[in-house]
Structure formats: structure tokens, C-alpha cells
Amino acid sequence: MWPRNDVHMDDGSMTPEDQEPVTDNDMEYNDNGEESSYSNGSSSSYNADKLSSSRPLQHKLDLSASPSRNNDLNPRVEHLIALFKDLSSAEQMDAFTRLLQESNMTNIRQLRAIIEPHFQRDFLSCLPVELGMKILHNLTGYDLLKVAQVSKNWKLISEIDKIWKSLGVEEFKHHPDPTDRVTGAWQGTAIAAGVTIPDHIQPCDLNVHRFLKLQKFGDIFERAADKSRYLRADKIEKNWNANPIMGSAVLRGHEDHVITCMQIHDDVLVTGSDDNTLKVWCIDKGEVMYTLVGHTGGVWTSQISQCGRYIVSGSTDRTVKVWSTVDGSLLHTLQGHTSTVRCMAMAGSILVTGSRDTTLRVWDVESGRHLATLHGHHAAVRCVQFDGTTVVSGGYDFTVKIWNAHTGRCIRTLTGHNNRVYSLLFESERSIVCSGSLDTSIRVWDFTRPEGQECVALLQGHTSLTSGMQLRGNILVSCNADSHVRVWDIHEGTCVHMLSGHRSAITSLQWFGRNMVATSSDDGTVKLWDIERGALIRDLVTLDSGGNGGCIWRLCSTSTMLACAVGSRNNTEETKVILLDFDAVYP
């Protein structure tokens, strides 16, 4: 247990007054770990001068009685003390032992209450700051928040940015800054009847939330930016896990057609449809910016470039089109495929497209130039991954192929599936490829191994085709048309959890935070799972038309928002995109 504010010190350490204990009004986190206000006017940066300096320690405890009791000291006790002083150290210890043995428990408890505080030292203030930091480096973020409540000295040390960097706060910097999307822009796009969002924040509370959203950067951010990032990321994760959903909106478009593809980049959402168009939406305003018209067939695949300047689309009209995100203008029409363009992947300005014509093509989207054609598959190319150098493709010919994008040469053909390959995942740093097939299996490959030995794991358990996969470390999560989500350890080749709850094919998968996965399904629901525990956290969206044709076609997300493409193939549910907000401000 960390020392609290009732700690008493001798002359060699801080008194309770020196400690300046943090009051209830000062606390940033209460005992339940929830945020509270802090308003002591602390400095915006760490100041070593504010820390109490180290002082020499006393070797004797000051246990003298109060003045009033000194006047009434029993002469017999004075005589006993005089005798005690003449004893050697060993004899004094023997005397203590005998006295304790002869004492009753009431006296022993009183003696303990007098002695114990002298052993509760404020060690952080006595140590050099560097040693104090080294100790705090071993604590969790939650423990550091508790440390900050002990005293102002401890608070100053615990807010040094280097300590919070050791917790990996750098990864939290990818969270976009808080937005104003629920301060009014989403009010006119209310969720329609027939859609249930459990735990949605109540309208009366939403006004308070809107006010808080205007205060994007709080006092802690000014004082300790990395601590503030940690607290914000923790709040965002709690918003996903359990807190009421802070805001929601509906983007209506594409009439009664199917939304076939969807991507998010910063504040831009792009949807493609079998109505031959794409729509570019401003998320924060909740409105369409452009409708991209030009394809003469349904749009089946699209991408937003990493720089955010280009939107690329592939269609059943056999063309690839490059559009400007800035003004929605058509920049290039890339021709060459002789059948539907079914899949694509981008790295920088280089695009790779896969087609039912059995080929892949490599393009430069900035210039519109065709760079290479990759021949080798004997049936339609269904999925592709690209890291800027290596292309990985999966086809209806049951194979996975590895290509050099610069030379157009096939480096390796991975065989083992006995039906069509529908999904791929490629982690270039470890040369790992995961492939999902209509043969119900998932294979994990290391294409740097000798030919014929590339398959390092065969994951079996699903009973239909795998529609999506995500990998972190050795943990792979897969969603399948059999209505189940499975969590795998690819190193061991075993299924860790099977997540059951959907009543129809799972259409999409998104991984959030440390251990949360969201899945959408043809049953009209979006579910959030804890893959570490193998348990359902909660339903995020439920369509009343689910089970009668209403479905969630796909998901895409940022760390603070989820977009759900909704509709039906029998007109039981209007086509739309539902946006859910899980954002939090910097405290």
C-alpha cells in the first residue's frame, strides 16, 4: 500500500504539513480510477526545486511524552529509564523483549501506534529524482495515478513525461485530436426508427457532453502532455467498452443499392456502391461533399491514398479511376483489365489491382502510368496485399502468389488450399501471409522458408469461407460465414477462443485498442468482443429488420469512431452509414 496523508515523520523527513497532502478537490483520479478535477495552480512543467531536498536521518525515535505528562512522570518510571540508559545495546534489547512479554495487548497496540509512523518514510522525496523516476518506471499507468494522490511532491515526480513514455504513450499519438462533431453538426442526422444503439447517451446529458467537447485540452495536458494522452486513450477505451455512446449520426445515400466498399481517412469517409457511384463524406459535418460519377458499372473496390489526396476505384466496367479528394474531380481512367476489377491495394502512389481476368496490374496513380502486368493466376484474382515492394495475391485457382512489384516476377506460389482463396493478410516485417479459403481452413505461411515448407500453421475449425482477418503479434482473429469469430495463436497453431453470438454470416471485422474486436453480420448486428477473455462485451448496433433482410455489410473505423454500412437486398432496410462516436477530450 502506498503511504497516505496520515504519515508522520521525524526531523529527518517531511511532516504532514511539508507533504502538502492532496485534498479531495485536488485529486485527478478517485479511488475508483475515475477522473476528478484538479485546481491547485501547479506549474505546467516539472520543477526539481519544488521537490523536498533530502535530509540526514535520525537514528533515535522521538517518543517523548507531551509536556503535560512530563510533569506527572512517575518517579518509579524515571528510575527505570535511568537504569535502562546504563544498559548495553544487547541488554536493552533483552529488556525490550521481556517488557513486551509482560505487557497486555492493549499496551502493545498503543506502542505500535507510536512506533509505526516512524518507519513510513517518504522515500521518493529523500531519493535523487533520477532514482525516483527509475522506481516509478516499474508501475502501471493506474498505479501512477494513485501515486499522484499521495502528495504534491509525488505528483510532480509522477508527471514527468519520461515516465509516461515508458508506458508506450507514443502509440496514443495516432489518436486524432478531439473533434466538434457532436457539438451540433450531428444533431440533424438522428438515428431513424428501427435502429437500436444500446447505452446511447441521453439527450439531456448530450448537451453537457457537447460543452465538454469544446474544451479539448484540459489542465493536465498543459502540465503533463504524455500523462494526458494516456488518460485520454484510457477514457476512449472505456467509451468503447462500457460507457454510453457519446454521439451518433446517419449518412443517407446510394438509395436502395448495396454499399460494396468503404474507407476512412482523417475526416473523410468514402463509400462505393453497385449504383456505379462513390460518395465522399465529411464526417464531422455529417454530410456528403461529392458524388463521384463516371463508372458505367458497379463499384466493387476502392482505396484512399496514404497522403489522402487520391481516391481510387475499381468497377465491373473493367476500369480503374483516380479521383481528387480535394474537389472530387476525375484525374485518370486506367484501362487494361478485360474483366471486373475486384480488389486493390496501395502503398504510397503505387497501386496494385486484381481482376477476374486472372491478372494483376501495377499503376502509378499520380501520373496514371501503367507500370507492370502480373501474369500467373489461372482464375480470377480475389484479394491482394501490397507493402510497396512485395505483392501477395489470392485467387480462385486455390493458390497464393508472391510477386516482386518492381520486376513483375512471381517469386513463389503457395499451394495447399483445395478451394478458392477469399481473404489475405500480409505482415511484411515477418514475411508472414495468412490466407482464408472456401475450403474452410486458414493457412499461415512464411514465404522465406524453403519451397514446399512455407506453410507453418494450418488453422482448422471454421465451417465456411473466412471473410476477414486481423493479426497482432501471434494472435490472429478471423471472422467467417459460419457466424463465428475465432481467436488463434499462430505460433502454436491452436484456437484460443471461439466467439459465438451472431446468427448469420459475419461480414466484417475491426480490431480496437489492446483486446477489443468489433464484428458486423448479415443478422443486422454489430457486436464488440473481448478477445483476451473470449467474451461478448456488448452489442453496438441492432437493426429491427435483422433476420428479415436487414444487414450490416461492412465496418471501418478510426480509434475514436465506427462507421457501419447498413442496408438490405429486399428493401427491408434503407441504405445508409451509421456513425458512432467514442471520442474523449484531453484531461
UniProtKB/Swiss-Prot annotation:
Expression (tissue specificity): Expressed in tail and head neurons.
Residue ranges of the TM segments: none
Disulfide-bonded cysteines: none
Keyword Cytoplasm: yes
Residues covered by the F-box domain: 121-167
Subcellular location, principal: other
InterPro entries: F-box-like_dom_sf, F-box_dom, G-protein_beta_WD-40_rep, WD40/YVTN_repeat-like_dom_sf, WD40_repeat_CS, WD40_repeat_dom_sf, WD40_rpt
UniProt feature, compositional bias: Basic and acidic residues: 1-11
WD repeat ranges, renumbered to this chain: 253-291, 294-333, 336-373, 376-415, 416-455, 461-498, 501-539
Record-linked Pfam families: F-box-like, WD40
An individual GO BP term: regulation of vulval development
Family matches, as PROSITE patterns: FBOX (PS50181), WD_REPEATS_1 (PS00678), WD_REPEATS_2 (PS50082), WD_REPEATS_REGION (PS50294)
Location of region: Disordered: 1-53
Subcellular location: Cell projection, Axon; Cytoplasm
The entry's keywords: Cell projection, Cytoplasm, Developmental protein, Differentiation, Repeat, Sexual differentiation, Ubl conjugation pathway, WD repeat
Domain of life: Eukaryota
Outcome of substituting residue 567 to E: In n1074; masculinizing phenotype. Does not self-interact in vitro or bind to skr-1 protein
GO cellular component, one term: cytoplasm
A GO MF label: protein kinase binding
Mutant lacking the gene: phenotype: Worms show a weak masculinization phenotype. Moreover sel-10 mutants suppress the egg laying defective (egl) phenotype of the sel-12 mutants. RNAi-mediated knockdown results in increased zyg-1 expression at centrosomes.
Record SUPFAM superfamilies: F-box domain (SSF81383), WD40 repeat-like (SSF50978)
PANTHER family: PHOSPHOLIPASE A-2-ACTIVATING PROTEIN
Functional description taken from the UniProt entry: Probable substrate recognition component of SCF (SKP1-CUL-F-box protein) E3 ubiquitin-protein ligase complex, which mediates the ubiquitination and subsequent proteasomal degradation of target proteins. Regulates synapse elimination in early development in the motor neuron HSNL. Cell autonomous negative regulator of lin-12/Notch-mediated signaling, with respect to lin-12 activity in cell fate decisions and tumorigenesis. May target the intracellular domains of lin-12/Notch proteins for ubiquitin-dependent degradation. Involved in sex determination by promoting female development.
Subunit note: Probable component of the SCF(sel-10) E3 ubiquitin-protein ligase complex which includes skr-1 and F-box domain-containing protein sel-10 as a substrate recognition component. Interacts with fem-1, fem-2, and fem-3. Interacts with the intracellular domain of glp-1 and sel-12. Interacts with lin-12. Interacts with skr-1. Interacts with zyg-1.
Protein name listed in UniProt: F-box/WD repeat-containing protein sel-10
Originating species: Caenorhabditis elegans
Gene encoding the protein: sel-10
